[in-house]
Amino acid sequence: LRQSIEMIAKLPLIAVYSYHSYRHFRKDETLFIRNPQRGLSLAENILLMLRPDGKYTELEAKVLDIALILHAEHGGGNNSTFTTHVVTSSGTDTYSSIAASIGSLKGPRHGGANLKVQNMFEDIKANVKDWSDEKEVENYLRKILDKEAFDHTGLIYGMGHAVYTLSDPREVILKRFARELAQEKGMMKEFALYELVERLGGSLVMEQRRLFKNVCANVDFYSGFVYTMLGIPKELFTPIFAIARIPGWSAHRLEEILNASKIIRPAYKYVGHHAGFVPYEERTPEEGCEEVLRDLEKGAATEAAGETGENTEKEAPEAAKERSEEKE
């Protein structure tokens, strides 16, 4: 418990100070370090330490506080929290358990989702001339779904959730505060674009994928926009998520320690082809095995050549041609 409380208190400092160090040593910008102040909330101290002038409005601190609360916990089924349970069950220490959870959260399918949303909207704003033109926005979203635009994955980021269909209650709350902050910042035009994409995106995803259940926006849809309005750099999007989720991870870790006595060992079911045992002396090379072995040998040779600086680019087309002729 003591270690968990210490991490809740110290991770904001580690994240913000690390970012300032990154700015200074990588971007040659001014390094400034500001100590947290007693009596301020965690959200207030983050804004205080992050900004050069240390100033923030009451609404800014309130919105960040709400965002942290909404991200603090979301059940034991999400990837990073389940990681907390699994690693804790091995009997390891608090720091190792939380480090593993942070490693999970770092993945773009988990904690990095809001950054994907923000990058997608930057792409939309750069390629859609009239943000209020519903038809133009819809056409560009269709291009995204058809893998013709943005990152060519066919995904509208921030839309859909593994559990929620009608609505993500966290998104509903965060959207309300995002509107208030957008009004204060004079960014209602951007907020209107987010609303339009939210309204069109769900139905377009359902249509394109032929889904029968509703597709709603999730909490990542507005969180990146909120962080941007607060002046939080993209490099801190996922660390802010980790700062928020530390209390939830800590609670789950304590729960695992108190209620479980065995290590978690998931069961696996083999879904491949079941082949009978063949004695070694009766085995014959399967069709295609020689080709696979040649590819593996060539890959090893290419890797070795790469380490010594040898250029192997010219060999690739010849190898491909050779394989093509063999198949014919």
Can you annotate each of these PLM segments?
Residues L1-E318, E322, E326-E328:
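Non-transmembrane, aqueous-exposed alpha-helical and coiled segments at domain scale
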